[in-house]
Amino acid sequence: MAKKSKIAKAKKQMAMIEKYADKRQELKAAGDRTALAKLPRDSNPNRLRLRDQTDGRPRGYMRKFGMSRIKFRELAHQGLIPGVKKASW
């Protein structure tokens, strides 16, 4: 389980990214680098670290499922993820 402060920071960053997304897109299209630099740092989506939705784990994140490899394995073994089954060959 990640620290609660880190999870809260990630949520705050997501809100800021959504808030400035349109403005950032317009400035990028216009090529106005100085105005882009004046936007808040956390409004840049490259600074966001994707985290597990259930426990906030930052590493081993699987984008397709929105969770870490550990949670994915637990839920897959329980059969709670549709379309996922254990491979055997």
From Swiss-Prot:
Task: Extract the Gene3D superfamilies matched here.
Answer: 30s Ribosomal Protein S14, Chain N (4.10.830.10)
GO cellular component, alphabetical, reads:
cytoplasm; small ribosomal subunit
Q: State the Gene Ontology terms under molecular function.
A: rRNA binding; structural constituent of ribosome
Write down the superkingdom of origin.
Answer: Bacteria
Region Disordered, residue ranges? 29-62
Q: Which GO terms describe its biological process?
A: translation
**Keyword annotations of the record:** Ribonucleoprotein, Ribosomal protein, RNA-binding, rRNA-binding
Q: Where is the composition biased (Basic and acidic residues)?
A: 49-58
- Family the entry assigns: Belongs to the universal ribosomal protein uS14 family.
Q: What does this protein do?
A: Binds 16S rRNA, required for the assembly of 30S particles and may also be responsible for determining the conformation of the 16S rRNA at the A site.
The subunit field of the Swiss-Prot or TrEMBL record says:
Part of the 30S ribosomal subunit. Contacts proteins S3 and S10.
> What is the protein named?
Small ribosomal subunit protein uS14A
Name the encoding gene, please.
Answer: rpsN1
